[in-house]
Amino acid sequence: MEKNIKEIKETIKADFVNSRAVIKNYETPDGTIYMTKTIEHFNIGIMDNYGALIWANDSNYSLTEDFETAWSDMVKNYSDYEVERLRKEIENKWF
């Protein structure tokens, strides 16, 4: 049974929320906790165990930032093709 985009988003969102426990103690030298908005580190909220830490010193998002905002900002500079490719990667990995 094919999942729709809303269900996929909810799965990603839930996984992202669950991942916070793994990384909540990471702080930069100035004490700020960061998450990245890049594909390489953020992995669309999919954690590949501890190795896929969500951190990036150049990010302006805190871990309390709204997921939808982070997702929208992350993909806004990508082409429709790239966003579709990411969506397919998520579907292939999860469903």
Q: For the regions a protein language model found, what residue spans apply to each?
A:
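Negatively charged, low-complexity tracts enriched in Asp/Glu with abundant Ser/Thr
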Residues: 1-30, 91-94
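Acidic, low-complexity, intrinsically disordered interaction modules
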Residues: 17-85
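Short, aromatic- and cysteine-enriched interfacial helices/patches
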Residues: 54, 94-95
